[in-house]
Amino acid sequence: MKSSPGLHIIIVGAGITGLATATSLRRAGHTVHLYEKSAQDNEIGAAIYVPPNVSQFLLPWGLDLDKWGFVKSQKVSFLHHASLETKMTLSDGMTAKGLTGAELYYAHRVDLHGCLRWMATRPEGPGRPATIHLMSNVVAYDPLAPSITLASGEVISADVVIGADGVRSDAVEAIIGDKVQTMRPRFANTCYRFLVPADAIEADPATQFWNEGSDGWSRVMIESVTGRSVVSYPCRSNTIHNFVLINNEENDTNMCAEDWHARFKIPDILKKFSDYDPRLLKVLSKAPDARRWPLIYRKPIHQWTKGCMTLAGDACHAMLPFLAQGGAQGIEDAVALGVVLQGATTRDDIQKRLQIYQEVRMKRASIIQILSNMGADHSVSVEDLKEYLNEDQMPYSQHDMMIHNYKYDVAEVAFEAMKRYDPSFRLGNDFLGR
């Protein structure tokens, strides 16, 4: 006997959030179609943190750490920018594992994307494989139908529409009636990404030192006067070193254009960090290319849901990278959606459950959004947090911040919210996979 197909759900955007949401919803028993405007034939990106607040779901969902090249965080050190001398190494009690009991991993963004795509579409496993429609540009939304309109003019209806279309979201306008204003930080407004092969480093005796003991080692080098920083950690089974260079650039008129495809001359970038240890600059020079990510943020929005349509990921809470929680918060959205929509039936029921999703997710995502943005714009302050937290709840120290971000189970929070809505609510045995 065939199981019920559940709801017909459309997800717009097949990035990390969209694919994680598709995985969560297929496990909840629904039929999922993703519409992605690109061909996804040349995925790009640098590395990404996969912290405990989401690795706790990805592992039981089938994440094979070795297959996808994830690297377990082993050590975090702060080095002097001009000498590379170690100033401080976090003790075991201050690591993600020590504080939460769960691991933090480093992954190449392409590998995480590939893993989530496999989870969402694999023939075996709980639920029905999600279907991805590439080169399908969505040009209009109707949250009340709900439906989407493709560039071809085709209108596609569903029980639920989820806008996971990223930082340049059009879906958000359908929810709140206007575009979300983008803002440039007052400080640290530019991020350069380098991916340096470990083999290239090893081939030069002058740079081999960077490979020594580098398994799972994250290194942070901050120049305190200007706030420039360099962060490095390995990914793809320790075969690639990911470097993030943060700088403030006041005279660039094109800073609001977020373009991962734009390439920049490495010597020109390194001149901006010329006071850093020459050995580090030599390591960076081994990168085949470098990409710039203009750091642009948005303030929290106060509505994610309208009718039978909602938002997830950067579409509703784009944030700066200083807490390395952007991707993780999108995955938390995905898990919450899988929980609240499990067993949904009628239109009225769906709308109420999407409101529960908003209540579960909006406060937490907004807090992390503000905390992330505080790292680069001093006009974003504690005052912004007071809308969401009392004074005694605010995470001021690094310890408190890590506990707040990492030691959190969104599935449990969403489950408790659903139990208040419907005391008979149950999660299917396959959903968490634990």
UniProtKB/Swiss-Prot annotation:
Gene3D superfamilies: FAD/NAD(P)-binding domain
Family classification: Belongs to the paxM FAD-dependent monooxygenase family.
Domain of life: Eukaryota
Protein name: FAD-dependent monooxygenase cfoG
Sample GO molecular function, one term: FAD binding
Keyword Flavoprotein: yes
SS bond partners: none
Required cofactor names: FAD
Catalytic residues of the enzyme: R193, Y233
Binding site for FAD: E36, D314, G327
Record-listed E.C. numbers: 1.-.-.-
Statement: the UniProt record of this protein carries the keyword RNA-binding: no
Description of how the protein assembles with itself and partners: Monomer.
InterPro entries for the chain: FAD-bd, FAD-dep_Monooxygenase_BioMet, FAD/NAD-bd_sf
A Pfam family the protein falls into: FAD_binding_3
GO biological process: flavonoid biosynthetic process
Organism the protein comes from: Aspergillus candidus
Protein's job: Monooxygenase; part of the gene cluster that mediates the biosynthesis of chlorflavonin, a fungal flavonoid with acetolactate synthase inhibitory activity. Within the pathway, cfoG is responsible for the hydroxylation of the flavonoid skeleton at position C8. The pathway begins with the PKS-NRPS hybrid synthetase cfoA that uses benzoic acid or p-hydroxybenzoic acid as a starter unit with four rounds of chain elongation using malonyl-CoA to form the chalcone skeleton.
Inactivation phenotype: Impairs the hydroxylation of the flavonoid skeleton at position C8.
SUPFAM superfamilies found in the cross-reference section: FAD-linked reductases, C-terminal domain, FAD/NAD(P)-binding domain
Keywords per UniProt: FAD, Flavonoid biosynthesis, Flavoprotein, Monooxygenase, Oxidoreductase, Signal
Signal sequence interval, chain numbering: 1-22
PANTHER family: FAD-BINDING DOMAIN-CONTAINING PROTEIN-RELATED, MONOOXYGENASE
This protein's pathway: Secondary metabolite biosynthesis; flavonoid biosynthesis
